[in-house]
Amino acid sequence: MLALLGATTLMLVAGRWVLPAASGEANLKPENVEIHIIDDNFFLKWNSSSESVKNVTFSADYQILGTDNWKKLSGCQHITSTKCNFSSVELENVFEKIELRIRAEEGNNTSTWYEVEPFVPFLEAQIGPPDVHLEAEDKAIILSISPPGTKDSIMWAMDRSSFRYSVVIWKNSSSLEERTETVYPEDKIYKLSPEITYCLKVKAELRLQSRVGCYSPVYCINTTERHKVPSPENIQINADNQIYVLKWDYPYENATFQAQWLRAFFKKIPGNHSDKWKQIPNCENVTSTHCVFPREVSSRGIYYVRVRASNGNGTSFWSEEKEFNTEMKTIIFPPVISVKSVTDDSLHVSVGASEESENMSVNQLYPLIYEVIFWENTSNAERKVLEKRTNFIFPDLKPLTVYCVKARALIENDRRNKGSSFSDTVCEKTKPGNTSKTWLIVGTCTALFSIPVVIYVVSVFLRCVKYVFFPSSKPPSSVDEYFSDQPLRNLLLSTSEEQTERCFIIENASIITEIEETDEIDEVHKKYSSQTSQDSGNYSNEDENSGSKISEEFPQQDSV
């Protein structure tokens, strides 16, 4: 054990000290006083300045800081050498400060006490090498590691389950092919070759405290010959809705398989936990290279899964253990959100589960919270909130402003922050505020009063434009009354219809008399017809027609 004292060391500085004056006595002084603590082993070591002085012994005392109760340090009383082991001292608390003092003795003469600086044993302790037990398979080595210290160790009593172990392994024939792995107290090293000698060494670590121990002695072991029944390989486990599917590869047919699992926390506890492996439901004596088991048979957490094969020749070794995290296999779908404007300065947001999520009942297995992000549609500045509720309100918003919202579901208290992808973005406009309503009313009233005025102005403008650019083709009535109807009427008559004087040659007087009478009658009729025509606005050419008739009759008389 003393060979390991070159690590963590507490230096106890001692000054020059002298035995009581006596004739011929030499001055003695201890030098380089050191304390080494490895696990529960305590060592005190120093150098003597004068080895020529005989019959000099050394003794040490200790006390808990502040108690003023010095006790003899067991194992370090009247020591003739320059080192002592005081591991037998029963310390009740390794986190309390301890004071040490040491002196030289020669017969009845003693030096004065020299005290060293107080120290805390736990802080000065070094992690020692673990004990290792090996067992060989054809392609693997089984490790059984005991934590540093004894079973009843007080130094690591609170840390026995916190140790992690680092293994360096190599083929005995070639130390250049080293490989380092981190293992649990009960673990396996895989991917080895049959019938090969492998050597390894192990050291323990407390990672949270950043403390690394020293390596164990080197252990060597031969792997066995190749097993007749090979082990299954490439273990995989997948989640599919409400079930888990366990798959593996196997090169031969006509084999049956068995699968087991172990809660991961057993791996951290030192000791043999082979009896803690449990049979996976629906995965015993299966003939296919997969098996299916329901989600509800497993509680939330991390498991290790292993498979082995059996046939007429025997049973294989267990396959390589596969870590299985139920949380990592859980599929969380994005939520469905709806947004509604409540007032001019708030929006109501409702978060619901998608149909896929409802079918998988994820929210029943794991409590969910929602990460909600919202922002103004015209801005990239986002605000993020976490909500356990599925209905909540965003207050203190701007009126008549468009806000956009998206959300995702997270597993509550999950260290890996596992969650779904974000939902579709939904945008909604807030309602108008009181000021906006007032301006809306004023604007509406102004528009109602302005419309008639605008219509009137436009109509007047159109009249002016029409009068200037599109005048009427008919002259005004004041001008038209100066024009008589007769000239206009005559202008419209054709040349053939103009009035002419007609001359007749009369040979028979009796006929003339008849004609005159007839003319008188016609004249009266003509006047009446003319008056009637003037009243009605129509004109008749009846006199001309009558004349023409008479002229037609005269030739008949002539012919007689």
Curated annotation (Swiss-Prot):
<feature type="compositionally biased region" description="Polar residues">
    <location>
        <begin position="529"/>
        <end position="540"/>
    </location>
</feature>
<feature type="glycosylation site" description="N-linked (GlcNAc...) asparagine">
    <location>
        <position position="55"/>
    </location>
</feature>
<keyword id="KW-0677">Repeat</keyword>
<dbReference type="GO" id="GO:0004905">
    <property type="term" value="F:type I interferon receptor activity"/>
</dbReference>
<keyword id="KW-0472">Membrane</keyword>
<keyword id="KW-0832">Ubl conjugation</keyword>
<dbReference type="InterPro" id="IPR036116">
    <property type="entry name" value="FN3_sf"/>
</dbReference>
<feature type="domain" description="Fibronectin type-III 3">
    <location>
        <begin position="333"/>
        <end position="433"/>
    </location>
</feature>
<feature type="transmembrane region" description="Helical">
    <location>
        <begin position="438"/>
        <end position="458"/>
    </location>
</feature>
<dbReference type="InterPro" id="IPR016669">
    <property type="entry name" value="Interferon_alpha/beta_rcpt-1"/>
</dbReference>
<feature type="disulfide bond">
    <location>
        <begin position="404"/>
        <end position="427"/>
    </location>
</feature>
<feature type="glycosylation site" description="N-linked (GlcNAc...) asparagine">
    <location>
        <position position="109"/>
    </location>
</feature>
<comment type="subunit">
    <text>Heterodimer with IFNAR2; forming the receptor for type I interferon. Interacts with TYK2. Interacts with STAT1 and STAT2; the interaction requires its phosphorylation at Tyr-482. Interacts (serine-phosphorylated form) with FBXW11, the substrate recognition component of a SCF (SKP1-CUL1-F-box protein) E3 ubiquitin-protein ligase complex. Interacts with SHMT2; this promotes interaction with ABRAXAS2 and the BRISC complex. Interacts with TRIM10; this interaction prevents association between IFNAR1 and TYK2.</text>
</comment>
<feature type="region of interest" description="Disordered">
    <location>
        <begin position="522"/>
        <end position="560"/>
    </location>
</feature>
<feature type="cross-link" description="Glycyl lysine isopeptide (Lys-Gly) (interchain with G-Cter in ubiquitin)">
    <location>
        <position position="527"/>
    </location>
</feature>
<keyword id="KW-0458">Lysosome</keyword>
<keyword id="KW-0967">Endosome</keyword>
<feature type="signal peptide">
    <location>
        <begin position="1"/>
        <end position="24"/>
    </location>
</feature>
<feature type="modified residue" description="Phosphotyrosine; by TYK2">
    <location>
        <position position="467"/>
    </location>
</feature>
<keyword id="KW-1133">Transmembrane helix</keyword>
<dbReference type="InterPro" id="IPR003961">
    <property type="entry name" value="FN3_dom"/>
</dbReference>
<dbReference type="GO" id="GO:0032496">
    <property type="term" value="P:response to lipopolysaccharide"/>
</dbReference>
<comment type="similarity">
    <text>Belongs to the type II cytokine receptor family.</text>
</comment>
<feature type="glycosylation site" description="N-linked (GlcNAc...) asparagine">
    <location>
        <position position="47"/>
    </location>
</feature>
<protein>
    <recommendedName>
        <fullName>Interferon alpha/beta receptor 1</fullName>
    </recommendedName>
</protein>
<feature type="glycosylation site" description="N-linked (GlcNAc...) asparagine">
    <location>
        <position position="172"/>
    </location>
</feature>
<feature type="lipid moiety-binding region" description="S-palmitoyl cysteine">
    <location>
        <position position="464"/>
    </location>
</feature>
<keyword id="KW-0732">Signal</keyword>
<keyword id="KW-0564">Palmitate</keyword>
<dbReference type="GO" id="GO:0005886">
    <property type="term" value="C:plasma membrane"/>
</dbReference>
<feature type="domain" description="Fibronectin type-III 2">
    <location>
        <begin position="231"/>
        <end position="329"/>
    </location>
</feature>
<keyword id="KW-0675">Receptor</keyword>
<feature type="disulfide bond">
    <location>
        <begin position="283"/>
        <end position="291"/>
    </location>
</feature>
<keyword id="KW-0812">Transmembrane</keyword>
<feature type="modified residue" description="Phosphotyrosine; by TYK2">
    <location>
        <position position="482"/>
    </location>
</feature>
<feature type="domain" description="Fibronectin type-III 1">
    <location>
        <begin position="126"/>
        <end position="226"/>
    </location>
</feature>
<feature type="glycosylation site" description="N-linked (GlcNAc...) asparagine">
    <location>
        <position position="254"/>
    </location>
</feature>
<dbReference type="InterPro" id="IPR015373">
    <property type="entry name" value="Interferon/interleukin_rcp_dom"/>
</dbReference>
<feature type="topological domain" description="Cytoplasmic">
    <location>
        <begin position="459"/>
        <end position="560"/>
    </location>
</feature>
<feature type="cross-link" description="Glycyl lysine isopeptide (Lys-Gly) (interchain with G-Cter in ubiquitin)">
    <location>
        <position position="526"/>
    </location>
</feature>
<feature type="region of interest" description="Important for interaction with TYK2">
    <location>
        <begin position="492"/>
        <end position="501"/>
    </location>
</feature>
<feature type="disulfide bond">
    <location>
        <begin position="76"/>
        <end position="84"/>
    </location>
</feature>
